[in-house]
Swiss-Prot record:
Family (UniProt): Belongs to the RemA family.
Pfam families given in the database record: RemA-like
Identification of the protein by name: Putative regulatory protein MAE_11840
Amino acid sequence: MDIQLINIGFGNIVSANRVIAIVSPESAPIKRIISDARDKGCLIDATYGRRTRAVIITDSSHVVLSAIQPETVAHRFVVNKEAPVNSSN
């Protein structure tokens, strides 16, 4: 299985294989997920102080905050899936 990476802004990268959901942070349930992750120490803030526009939830229950739009992250995710990087062995 190849490791595929997604740029989530400002040089930050997450593993595409570990992503469960990419959602907008405006709803109350997502705000609660962010708050719970912060309390548990499972929150990764990759916004560099900017407004949170996308919340990425991973299979390890980590929550990653990104300053780019969820649609942009999802587009990068789809493009990555269609054109995987060839690894030289």
